[in-house]
Amino acid sequence: LLFRNVAIALVAAGFIFTGSASPAKAWNCVQFVHQVSAVKLSGDAWRWWSAALGRYERGKQPERKAVLVFDHTSRMVHGHVAIVADLVNKRIIQIDHANWSIGRFGRGQIARNVRVQDVSEKNDWTSVEVWNELDQCWGRPYKALGFIYAR
């Protein structure tokens, strides 16, 4: 009986953390975006911008289901990609992405409806900040290369 209760608790924990009845999977951002997006690219996240040339439309304005491409940095050597989930206003969007921060549940977790704000001087989404839910504040500015549209 104890074993059955522990097994049920573990399955429930997997459901709570992942939104499904399967155990939590550790994702990187590229795996996640490739899985949920119509944009089918691979390799380092920051390289998606150039890889999309000639295959997908690219631009500087967010749209639902577009892929936001973050440039690489010394701390984020592979860059980052995320899916635009919703448009809040001209300067704020919500994204779904994976493996952004360690947070409460460890690396590789999927975060949904995370706010991102455009902090670029020209309002062209070349510099963005990501909302840190745990600390309830905006993070540091990151260079964004743009949006890839699945069309």
Labelled PLM ranges:
Residues 1-10:
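Bacterial N-terminal signal peptides that target proteins for export
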Residues 24-88:
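Secreted/periplasmic proteins that engage bacterial cell-wall peptidoglycan
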